[in-house]
Amino acid sequence: EEAARLVSVQPPASALMYAQDKLAMRERLTDMGIPCPAWARVEDEAQLAEFGATIGWPLIVKTPRGGYDGHGVAVAHSPADVSSWWGNGPLLAEALVPFTGEVAALLARTPSGEIASWPVASTVQVDGVCAEVTAPAVGIRPETAAEAQRIGERIADELGVTGVLAVEMFVVGEGADERVLVNELAMRPHNTGHWTIDGAVTS
């Protein structure tokens, strides 16, 4: 923020915070009406137990900052499973989503608001790490892919993202009920876009 007073810093800190802090991201996307898994900010074991009692166990617990590729993420069957995580601030608790697939919307946005999108890709995660990407996405309805792209572009616009944005999403439901839920954001060249190095005109 101090540097931004002297020179243009892109993406701006006001956008980057939503890729750095998962709680801030969930709060902002929920305020925007973007579809997300059920979630809660939990300050202690009692709040985690209450959330688990409401949505059912197991659930996902994440550290708001510093997690990537499966780090800082746990499947909790009870508060005891993350008992060592307390003491560094609140945690993000989320419903364990019964997804049928995963996709990623990848786009680039200029400071003036122009957006170019690559085809929505389907992804396969192994132990929290992206292991396979297929573009265009397979196994989902064209309408679902179009909705995923619209969501990605809306997030980029409303957060004021510049540069590359990847929006990872879960695919849930079947047939006409198929839809996407936003999992995480990455405001950087992302592994779901590595295919563009050889598979697209621009990368």
Protein language model regions, located:
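Internal, well-ordered alpha-helical scaffold/interface segments
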Residues: 146, 150-153, 167, 180-183, ...
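Conserved metal-phosphate-binding beta-hairpin within the catalytic cores
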Residues: 160-194
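Thr-Gly-centered strand-to-loop micro-motif
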Residues: 12, 94, 167
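Short beta-strands and strand-loop turn motifs
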Residues: 10-12, 61-64, 189
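Short, intrinsically disordered, charge-balanced linker/junction segments flanking boundaries
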Residues: 4, 193-203
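ATP-binding N-terminal substructure of ATP-dependent carboxylate-amine bond-forming enzymes
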Residues: 1-15, 31, 46, 50
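Active-site nucleotide/adenylate-binding loops and adjacent lid/helix of ATP-dependent enzymes
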Residues: 18-155
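Short, flexible active-site loops
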Residues: 128-137, 186-197
